[in-house]
Amino acid sequence: MSVEPNQIRNILTLRYDPSQNSLLPALQWNDFSINTHDPSLEHIEKYIENYISKKVENSDVKRISLALSGGVDSSLILAFIRNTLPELKIDTISVKFADSIDETKTAEKIAEHLEVDHHVIFLENYLRDLPKAISITKLPFWDLHWYYVAKKAQTFSKYLAAGDGGDEVFGGYTFRYAKFLSLTNPKSTALEKAKAYLKCHERDSVTDQEEVFGEHITFSWNLIYEQILPYFDNSLSVLDQVLLADYNGKLMYNFSPINNKINNYFELTSITPLLSNDIISYATNLQSKYKYDEINNIGKIPLHQLLKKYNLDSLILNTKQGFSVNTLNLWKSYAQKLCKDYLSDSRVVKDGWINGDWIKKYIDRNDLDVRYVNKFLGLLAFEVWYRLFVSKEMKSETNLN
């Protein structure tokens, strides 16, 4: 395996690479053929129920696992599975990260309400199994919590369900929408909107991003803008342009391929009802005002309405992070030392892929902004990937302690 400069530039700037293969259909701006009809909860219910029934059509299936964060999407899918297949035994799984916001109590309440067995994975050192996870995905991503979910799930069942796609398809990234709308106006050009969009994803890059790379990787922001521009150079509404960019970004080229590779490794069948062709087609034809309430900054409106129908709305947190580790605290506990261990004698620096001076400038600092911590985690993942597949000096069983 060799280094693809464009891939590394994209992953370390956008946290995804559009050259990757994805199981999801790519969307173009003209796929958003907006109709004028009000949203139909019955249609959404039918599509989800049909998908679940077809995926678990084998009568021998007695048990299924589900990743339950306690948020809207995973809770709703749990309710649908419980109602569609009431005889099925369900094991829900949540992840609790050390020194991070603990949302597992919410997930436990939802699991108890729907009478399913709930399991919590506690991760003291989130990065410990990074070599093993990267050996499976074969991509230099550090945010691989799905490895732990799938590893646990395969002890219960060969089916793993999730609420993946709800945010991208039904408009759940409300904090980004509000910021994007504040940065743009009706006269904004496609380039101005592309730049504003990236400002809404600031945690993926650093202020001196151009200094991160070595001599073998050409970086300019124009190369990044060129990949984003097509999503904003069309006649769609501003919010639909953002939804188009979100769908064709991390969902297509990070979350979906990563989760599928990990599930395949553990011989798990993925069940993702919110990413069925029917749901994607229906949601993209739904006017954005029916997905996102700009005045009250509320997204995923149809899914919230379904939660209320299933009497789950009172159990869901108003602000939900999902499976999210506090990287600032992770830096203090494990990540800084691990980065020093692996990046102080870095193979990717020696071979000209990453700028060693940039690493030296920041690695000893204890007051790093979260953007720089995240960048170091990305560099650590790249270093691990490089030692696994290029220099081949690291074993996948290596633990980062």
Where are these regions (language model features)?
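Short Ser/Thr-interspersed hydrophobic loop/turn segments at strand-loop and sheet-helix junctions
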Residues: 247-261, 282-283, 381
